[in-house]
Amino acid sequence: MAVLNPMTLGIYLQLFFCSIVSQPTFINSVLPISAALPGLDQKKRGNHKACCLLMPPPPPLFPPPFFRGSRSPLLSPDMKNLLELEASPSPCMQGSLGSPGPPGPQGPPGLPGKAGPKGEKGDLGRPGRKGRPGPPGVPGEPGPVGWPGPEGPRGEKGDVGMMGLPGSRGPMGSKGFPGSRGEKGSRGERGDLGPKGEKGFPGFPGMLGQKGEMGPKGESGIAGHRGPTGRPGKRGKQGQKGDSGIMGPPGKPGPSGQPGRQGPPGPPGPPSAGQLVMGLKGERGFPGPPGRCLCGPPANVNNPSYGDPMYGRGSPRVPAIFVVNNQEELEKLNTQNAIAFRRDQRSLYFKDSLGWLPIQLTPFYPVGLHHKAAWHLCGDGVLQPGEECDDGNPDVSDGCIDCHRAYCGDGYRHRGVEDCDGSDFGYLKCETYLPGSYGELRCTQYCSIDSTPCRYFT
């Protein structure tokens, strides 16, 4: 038997179902349409129109759903559509009912309908039967250790057992309370004198103790050998100025100097009897005419021709003022009637026909300062009158301080000669002079350090 194609089989089934549905006897046997719609037969009977051939409807694409359940007078929407098709007016006359045909094959199951709304909650049912006991569970973990129970009554003493092996030594017990003091025992006999022990090693030197008071003067000892020569002592304070010595013999006369300039003639004095007597100072004269300013630019240094002279064209004029360092630079200048200032001597010179002549023999000092207080001269490295020394540096720890020789008591520690001077210890303290001590050092009148005030920690 040949197997049909599924598509061909589907077409045959649709044609078969359509032929069955077209017969009203089969439909009436399956579904009582007449009972549900009583006016349908009357409509068909009252219609006496011409009869025509009934063409079967086209087969549906899908087979009709299979009806399950009890027959109900209420029809589904698909059945209503089918009844409307049958209720349509037909020109053919309905014949007599034929015999019922054989039941058709069971159709395929229909698609499930949509879920209806959820119903109301029903009443509580009866309790079910008790289920079987389940398998035993896993044993639980052990619980915490409980509190110890009350101590029971002491039992009776048992029989003496066999002596066992000696056990290990137990822990040392706590120290007991001191016992009562016993009575003093009798004095024992003196033992024999033991042999003399060997001499021990010398111990470590102890800490430096405090200086004790001066003890009584002891007896004079035997003259010892002469010790080595010590280092020279500290320099003493500056002594008082001694008496002036006897004047020495006069020295040899020096070479004759250059002749000085001839001074202006003085006023005629009063006649005298062979002796010159200086008269009294006269009154102050009237002020002279005001001077004139020479403000014109110089034409030439060696031959000046600027400005009008105050006292006529015949008076000499100073063309320029030069600043030189020493005598060599001064001799190189050939400008007549010029003034030069020497830095090494701090003095002025004037150029004359005879050469350079000094104007000031001593340096110039500010007004109000004494000659010995020439502070601007000290430290230039040149020894000048009024200075004991001049090393040209501001160091106060050497032998020359402020152009005076250092001495013990000037307040400055002379490096390499003095240990201290006043409060100048050279950055020394008790902590650095005597390690491990504290306090303040003291300077003696001989410029040496006294460490008596230093104390050690005890």
UniProtKB/Swiss-Prot annotation:
Residues 100-111, 133-151, 262-271 have a biased composition (Pro residues). Residues 95-271, 279-293 form the Collagen-like domain. Expressed in skeletal muscle, heart, brain, as well as in lung, spleen, testis, but not liver. The short isoform represents about 5% of the transcripts in the soleus muscle and about 15% in the heart ventricle. The triple-helical tail is stabilized by disulfide bonds at each end. It is found in: Synapse. Keywords: Collagen, Disulfide bond, Neurotransmitter degradation, Repeat, Signal, Synapse. One of its GO terms (biological process) is regulation of synaptic assembly at neuromuscular junction. Residues 117-126, 181-199 have a biased composition (Basic and acidic residues). GO terms for cellular component: basement membrane; collagen trimer; collagen-containing extracellular matrix; extracellular space; neuromuscular junction; plasma membrane. Residues 129-132, 234-237 are annotated as: Heparan sulfate proteoglycan binding. It comes from the Eukaryota. GO terms for molecular function: extracellular matrix structural constituent conferring tensile strength; heparin binding; structural molecule activity. Residues 51-67 are annotated as: PRAD. The keyword Zinc does not apply. The proline-rich attachment domain (PRAD) binds the AChE catalytic subunits. Belongs to the COLQ family. Anchors the catalytic subunits of asymmetric AChE to the synaptic basal lamina. This is Acetylcholinesterase collagenic tail peptide. It comes from Rattus norvegicus (Rat). The lineage of its organism: Eukaryota, Metazoa, Chordata, Craniata, Vertebrata. The gene is Colq.
